Amino acid sequence: MQNVGFIGWRGMVGSVLMDRMVQENDFANINPIFFTTSQAGQKAPVFAGKDAGELKNAFDIEELKKLDIIVTCQGGDYTNEVYPKLKATGWNGYWIDAASALRMEKDAIIVLDPVNQHVISEGLKNGIKTFVGGNCTVSLMLMAIGGLFEKDLVEWVSVATYQAASGAGAKNMRELLSQMGELEASVKAELANPASSILEIERKVTAKMREDSFPTDNFGAPLAGSLIPWIDKLLESGQTKEEWKGYAETNKILGLSDNPIPVDGLCVRIGALRCHSQAFTIKLKK
């Protein structure tokens, strides 16, 4: 039975993964070992009745070297720190990652098996050991219109995405809820009075959003009652990195990096917890 290490299993993505693995009875076929960045030595969680002993230190390269497979949902900073150190030891196990840090590496494959199973299978034959989850909106787009790409019918795509707080992580989801709570509290009395002016309510809400004390540490701006047409950092091209991913990751997933299809658009963060939405304009070849 293979030793499989899990890092970042308590976060938003990790929690969903654990639930799914329990549903699919995946723990029956592995020896799970759980790692932590802050609570090493404490009791490990029990999934599907399997006692995994104590939590291991997620930065302990010697412990990580013992694993056949590593599944990490810890984020890009962790990957950037640990992955090169682990590979430098000669470790030759499988690294499966939800973060974006390794997506565009030459020896990594972005996994979207309903669309690029042929790329995954070829990579396994060629000894690829690093597999990375794709960008959320890129994956959704290809699940929706992947058949058009497969039939070589697409000349270009323009996409507008409307992305929930969950795409930025659990801390951002909490911040959105905190923002919602503060806005509601600021006009609680007015909302209880049907005769109160909606314009006055709106003015008070806007004033609250502009206060220095309003919680924006994670998003950098109010999201509750608003939206943010900017996700990730600015690139030299003038795109945000999230917009660039639509082009770069789409073509890598499809194995088209040498003859890429243009993909561009606008990515907007909206005040929803987990619901993403997209709108496409597609030019077809026929």
From Swiss-Prot:
Residues reported in the UniProt entry to bind NADP(+): R10, G11, M12, V13, T37, S38, Q74, S166, G167, P194
Function: Catalyzes the NADPH-dependent formation of L-aspartate-semialdehyde (L-ASA) by the reductive dephosphorylation of L-aspartyl-4-phosphate.
Family: Belongs to the aspartate-semialdehyde dehydrogenase family.
Pathway it works in: Amino-acid biosynthesis; L-lysine biosynthesis via DAP pathway; (S)-tetrahydrodipicolinate from L-aspartate: step 2/4; Amino-acid biosynthesis; L-methionine biosynthesis via de novo pathway; L-homoserine from L-aspartate: step 2/3; Amino-acid biosynthesis; L-threonine biosynthesis; L-threonine from L-aspartate: step 2/5
Name assigned to this protein: Aspartate-semialdehyde dehydrogenase
Single GO MF annotation: aspartate-semialdehyde dehydrogenase activity
Keyword Lyase: no
EC number(s) recorded for this UniProt protein: 1.2.1.11
List of residues binding substrate: Q163, E242, R269
Gene: asd
Top-level taxon: Bacteria
